[in-house]
Amino acid sequence: MPKRDDINSVLVIGSGPIVIGQAAEFDYSGTQACRVLREEGVRVILVNSNPATIMTDPGFADATYIEPITSEVLEKIIIKERPDAVLPTLGGQTALNAAIRLDELGILAKHGVELIGAKVEAIQKGEDRQLFKDLVIESGADVARSHVAKTLEQAVEFAEDLGYPLVIRPSFTMGGLGSGFAHTRQELERMVADGLQSSPTTEVLLEESILGWKEYELELMRDTADNTVVVCSIENVDPVGVHTGDSITVAPALTLTDREYQHMRDIGIDIIRRVGVDTGGCNIQFAVDPADGRLIVIEMNPRVSRSSALASKATGFPIAKIAAKLAIGYRLDEIPNDITKVTPASFEPTLDYVVVKVPRFAFEKFPAADAELTTTMKSVGEAMAIGRNYSTALQKALRSLEKRGSSFHWGPESRSVDELLETSRTPTDGRIVTVQQALRAGATAEQVFDATKIDPWFIDQIVLINEVADAVRDADELDAETLREAKDHGFSDAQIAEIRGLVEQEVRDARHAADIRPVYKTVDTCAGEFPALTPYHYSSYDSETEIVPSDRRKVIILGSGPNRIGQGIEFDYSCVHASFALADAGYETIMINCNPETVSTDYDTSDRLYFEPLTLEDVLEIVHVEQQAGELVGVVVQLGGQTALGLAKGLEAAGVPILGTSPSAIDLAEERGLFSGILDTAGLVAPRNGTAVAIDEAVVVAEGIGYPVLVRPSYVLGGRGMEIVFDTATLHDYFLRMADQGIIGEGKPLLIDRFLDDAIEIDIDAIYDGTELYVGGVMEHIEEAGIHSGDSSCTLPPVTLGRGQIQQVVDAARAIAEGVGVRGLLNVQFAIGAGVLYVLEANPRASRTVPFVSKALGIPLAKAASLVMVGTSIAELKASGLLPERDGSDVPMDSPVAVKEAVLPFKRFRTKDGLIVDSVLGPEMRSTGEVMGIDRDFPRAFAKSQEAAFGGLPLSGTVFVSVADRDKRSIVLPVLRLQQLGFEVLATAGTAEILSRNGIQARVVRKYSEEPAAGDSPSIVDLINRDEVDVVINTPSGRTARADGYEIRAAAVAADKALFTTIAQLTAAVASFDAIRAGFDVTSLQDYAIAREARR
């Protein structure tokens, strides 16, 4: 049937901040939905708390609300905007749970708003573990033996029936949060307690163990006429026991017989019908026992999921876009295929290639965490690759991770076969490389299967890769036949060079001399049956290319690769905006990226998309083919984070024009000695500092500066490897760890700075065109210096800096931009201590705050910067209206205040003892995402940011206080205010004594480490675990920051308590309590823009 005429406006609920298990794929889904709904003439109202998303740009919705995703806020938006319907199926678990809550509270019925995309009954059937289990059994399909428990006592009782080990799965959670395998009653009790806490319905499923079974997924879509398509089958290379988000996956499924696949397909279609998903998509997971072929259904997601984004990129079938159309009444056969233009969406995609996804982990950020992979998702990103066979796709995906040791290698291996096999028994990041090394060392495929339960077919493919490597090594010369064989199995020039004992350029020269270059094939959804009209390409060493020549001037934009802590969706935001701006300016835009989660890898974001690894070899080959197909103006490297910047020198050396800031200028900012010269010339001050490439040098520099010092490697993002070091012994230990990781050495010096304690940190984002500096925004960090800027909350405009100080910051940034030779974006970090402005670092590239600044002040920084890179002046951008005349350094007094807050993943990472890793913040970034609060003043904006990031602050109850000696003076006023607000105060003995002297009565509780006296009260950890504490204030003392109070902080995180580890954050929170009690107003970005124009 045609589009429904009774739906004229739709409220789309986004997924909120990037967290493990719910990442950039929902920005991709939501952006697609907003686009298609507006194309259909539907008024779109969007709510999302994440400013780093493309979907929250005002151009993608008619009313855009960057607000907390809570029932109260959603009702206010509904009252204000009067939507006809709410679409929750494209915003992950966050949106789905929010929609169910609106229904339960009667808010939808009260305001006459319909839920579209999935009915509440369908959501309940798909998400409620018991309902779904009953439904699968009714269909005649099989499930694992299981029980649903709502209490710990029930769980213990059911475990006796099921036996150990068993699986715990909470209801209505995402990314496997709170799930796991329990081998003992002690593990069961801990995991069930976590699971009940994580589940919004307080229930967990206890399931018989299916460890080691093969795992599969189907992506399905269904419309109101009961047309159902299976978009894609996905197979997990890792067996059951590893969360699918942490497993290497392959599409299409490769080890199923046709009969098995058809059986799985029939079950999937029957389930989607019984659940009642009839206006959208769903994902169903299956397991197959390799011993006897028994097939069971594990679970389903009655919404667009993480796997949906992967399936969309793998097939070219835009699941989110089609789901949005189905939600407003279309049938599948009424929706044309964007890629072919002649086939409808009711045609199932067909693949004539193989797609492999490999997860990206960040265990280096959490050294105390247990790195074993389980049913709780721990990866922070993923890379995807497309190849004509599995070995090519796998090798391309592994090198897309950009991690040392992540690709197969053939250098010396010190471990024995037995050691390698034993290591491979435990699923960890990089297990696939351990398997390759074990096979290379002489292990049989059978031994590897016994150790890992990875299907023998996948093991045989690694055997084949090793055989090809042997042939490359043993060849008399590196001839065309040998090279082509290696390339047909995905070997990079660097791998071939390692095997042959050559340098990479020698292999490249030999390959080019033999005229062996990749060709580029097209993702077309139909295995070549119909012509593809969207240029979405992948490389192959076949004979025929599918690149169409063009007479337009081209610009290549390098993306940022897989998400990781320190380099996430914020950089993709800048790449996407550059593509839009350059296309509007008449350039043909070419995107290179390998991240399936992002908007940049949508086939209609750029004129041409290459889904390829971001390595020098892969990028140079694309540059070559594009130069053959027309005029290439240059390559943009300053938007894709350190990934793209790291390729700048190699590209320039190969004669490729780099747009914007030159590689030599980038070096000026990164190389400490050169940058110090620029600061001296400009009369600017940096903290006392030095560099070292050897440990003896480092000790001399550190002792000359005086401890504590801040140490960090060069050329890294997200503060990787950054630490505060208090003595020489710690410096020795630090240096050895960094050197082992290969991030300190010749050409990569260690940077050593005086640590500025009690300083205010400031960020500025700006654009420089060689003549004029245009300030995007000046941000003041709420936490003191020493906490990474990516983890610190910040406010825009600043709330404690005077106009004179802001002007001083702007003047310093201008001098740095001129001295470095910036053309495009510049981010500079400063600190003000004892009245002195210090320059901490300058980055001549996009920063992670660009989206926040753009949303807070309505300045399209990334678009403007991309045009400056191709020669447009800031004066011309002002004249065109793209940039406002008044820049972000001059914010009117009555402007709204925006606060950015970081979201941290501590709850995902536990030690081997089961404790959550320490949540103390420091100079190494550990946040996965961010939220924004915006309102008329700082207290209200901060309150919104806390609501969006952590679910809000309690307005009454019990507060526990235990702080380091240095903070005892600062703690008095905030705690006094909390007591005045009605909080009962608990404290450890030392802190309670200080509070008492200042007129604050506190009940003394013992520390976790103190022995209880006879008849003594419970420890603070016991009280937190009993839910008798609402707010925890615990600041660690400097030298023992990682240990002091750790148990207290771990308990607070596990119990989802409000936790403050800095006085600055606490002070801001206390100031916001009155704002929270008064309630929030909601204002769209479009309304803020109208008010901004009126002020100009």
UniProtKB/Swiss-Prot annotation:
Residues at which Mn(2+) 1 binds: 285, 299
BP GO annotations: 'de novo' UMP biosynthetic process; glutamine metabolic process; L-arginine biosynthetic process
CDD domains the record matches: MGS_CPS_II (cd01424)
Entry EC number(s): 6.3.4.16, 6.3.5.5
Cofactor binding annotation: Binds 4 Mg(2+) or Mn(2+) ions per subunit.
Annotated Mn(2+) 2 binding sites: 299, 301
GO cellular component, one term: cytoplasm
Gene3D superfamilies referenced in this protein's UniProt entry, alphabetically: 3.40.50.20, ATP-grasp fold, A domain, ATP-grasp fold, B domain, Carbamoyl-phosphate synthetase, large subunit oligomerisation domain, Methylglyoxal synthase-like domain
InterPro entries given in the database record: ATP-grasp, ATP_grasp_subdomain_1, CarbamoylP_synth_lsu, CarbamoylP_synth_lsu_oligo, CarbamoylP_synth_lsu_oligo_sf, CbamoylP_synth_lsu-like_ATP-bd, CbamoylP_synth_lsu_CPSase_dom, MGS-like_dom
Sequence positions that bind ATP 2: 712, 754, 756, 761, 786-789, 829, 841
Binding residue positions for Mn(2+) 4: 841, 843
Chain residues that bind Mg(2+) 4: 841, 843
Chain positions covered by the region annotation Carboxyphosphate synthetic domain: 1-402
Domain MGS-like positions: 951-1095
This protein's domain notes: The large subunit is composed of 2 ATP-grasp domains that are involved in binding the 2 ATP molecules needed for carbamoyl phosphate synthesis. The N-terminal ATP-grasp domain (referred to as the carboxyphosphate synthetic component) catalyzes the ATP-dependent phosphorylation of hydrogencarbonate to carboxyphosphate and the subsequent nucleophilic attack by ammonia to form a carbamate intermediate.
Protein role: Large subunit of the glutamine-dependent carbamoyl phosphate synthetase (CPSase). CPSase catalyzes the formation of carbamoyl phosphate from the ammonia moiety of glutamine, carbonate, and phosphate donated by ATP, constituting the first step of 2 biosynthetic pathways, one leading to arginine and/or urea and the other to pyrimidine nucleotides.
HAMAP family reported in the protein's UniProt record: CPSase_L_chain_B
Record's protein name: Carbamoyl phosphate synthase large chain
Gene name per UniProt: carB
